[in-house]
């Protein structure tokens, strides 16, 4: 069931992304999931790590990486990203994309069920 929710989230990636000029113009948050090949998740994770390095203060970057980590079976790391992203949301929820908030709430509940 969780896998279905996660894969559904991949198809529904229509959330908006702010493009601040001060943050790397070369790497956008959307790069994490661009050209995703489920047979090359290690390569996707490497790209996603670069996105998080550039945009680690944005919950969307951590949400995307948590999805990849979950697909790779690295649930503890995925839940750590979810926890960090939720903390960022609590700091500034006014500017958060509602889709990101929803995704993180679903993943957070899933992580809590494992404990």
Stretches with model-predicted labels:
Residues 11-15:
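Bacterial signal peptide processing site
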Residues 23-47, 54:
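Alpha-helical segment of the N-proximal tetratricopeptide repeat
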Residues 24-25, 59-60, 93:
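Helix-start (N-cap) detector for alpha-helical repeat units in TPR-like alpha-solenoids
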Residues 37-38, 71, 110:
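Register position in tetratricopeptide repeats
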Residues 93-115:
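TPR/TPR-like alpha-solenoid helical repeat scaffolds
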